[in-house]
Structures are given as C-alpha cells and as structure tokens.
Amino acid sequence: MEEAPDRYARYTRLKFDRPHPGVLRVTFASPLKMGAMDARMHREVSEIWADVDADDSVAVVIVTGDGRSFSAGGDLNHERKVCDDYALRMQAMTESRNLVMGMINCRKPIVGAARGWAVGAGLALLVLADVSIASKDAKFSDGHMKIGVAAGDHATIIWPLLCGMAKAKYYLMTAETFTGEEAERMNLISMALADEEVEAKALEVASRLARSAPAALRWTKHTLNHWLRQAAPIFDASLALEFIGFAGPEGREGIDAFLQKRPAQFSQDTPV
C-alpha cells in the first residue's frame, strides 16, 4: 500500500492511501464525534476534487469514513456562527456548491463506502458518488428540516432522479432516518451489504474500474452526469434558499434547539 503524493499534504481532515494501482482512497479524519465536519473539513471536502482530477496517477477514488460512522454532517456549533456572520455564510454556501459540482464534474469515478451514520453533507458525499455502497444497518438522514432550513445542499439535484419525487419529498420534508437497506430498496444508493463486506466491495469495484478503458469510463460518467448538470439551476435555487434560512429565525431556532437538546419551537407566523 502506497502513500499519496505531496499534492495532498495540505489536507489535515482527510487521509490518503493507495490500496491498489490507480486507486486513491480518501478517508475522513474528523476530530469531532461520529465524523462530524468542522469548518476545515467542510472546506477540504469541497476542494479535494480539483486535486484528484489533476492527479494523473489516479484513475478511481474511494471515499470512506474513519471509525464507526461515515460522517454525521456539519458541526452545528460552527453552523450557528454561520447564522450570524454574512462572510461565513457565503463561504459555507460556496463550499457547498463546490462540493456538489466538484463531485459531478470530477472526471475520475468516485466510489463511496459508508458504515454507521451518514447525515447532511456526509450523506451528500455518499449519494453523489458514482457507485455508492453502504452497510445494511447504516443510518441515513437529511436533517435540514430539523434545524429549520430548506434541503438545499445536494438533495434537489439528485434525489428525485435516483429514488423518485415521492420518496424524495417524503424523506426530505420529514427528515426521517432510514437504513442503508432501505436506501438500496428505493435506489438512493447502488448497494447495501453486511457491514464487514462494505470496504472490501468498494475496493473490488474501484480496482475493476481502474483496469477499465480510461477514456471510455470517464466519458460514460461525463455524459451520464449531464442529467445532473441540467438540474443545476434547481440546485442553485435550493442552495440559496437554504442559506436564506440560516440567516432567518427558523435556522437560528432549529440549531439552538438542537444544541440545547430541546424540541424546536418554530413560529407559524414566519414570513415566507
């Protein structure tokens, strides 16, 4: 197993290794509980795709978690600061857009391997992978509604295409938790396996792709992802509305309630 080259040395929240020729494995190395993303990690997962794309030694990328969870999403202590700081809000919005479009436009196929929790931005990283593999008992949730903001980071651009509008609306509007097995059943991910099989299967798929005809493989991804690119205006609108929510009373109340471990009290008189 080889270490990754120096181009990745600046990353402190991501670890890199090469488990197979042409395969770069990116492992989340968050210092927070359950792999939650602090501000630095959020920035790094938005920037890594340009470096991967420029690395001629990489044919395929595996994205995986470090420990019992894939990623529990954003750090709400930081997101509370985002509510009150315009510069932080714009930075977070730009990073969110770069994460989504970076994965879509990265020429190299991405294989996601998730065990444990995948929430918010963590779930985005799995669902946007070209091949998404999770344990059957993994726990997924898009929790935007719970914290009083619109589901805006990745869901509107890809969920209706993968699982249909009915399922997308249900899970995004209720923020209900569901398992990896349920995600496979509704076609949100490629496959769900026993927990101990996930990492090996991800490496098997990535190794197979790395041996494929590179131009044909990349062109196949590129053309299929036109389905997502044509939905980019929908994504931009949802992302903007999400961050309007962060600046409003619902976003503040939702995050405060979560941090204070109490039910949120959303006013039904909030202007819309």
Enumerate the predicted regions with their spans.
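Conserved CoA-thioester-binding segment of acyl-CoA-metabolizing enzymes
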Residues: 1-66, 101
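Terminal low-complexity tails and localization/encapsulation signals of metabolic enzymes
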Residues: 1-14, 256-272
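Terminal peptide-recognition signature
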Residues: 26, 30, 45, 63, ...
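Hydrophobic alpha-helical membrane-association signature
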Residues: 41-44, 92-95, 198, 238
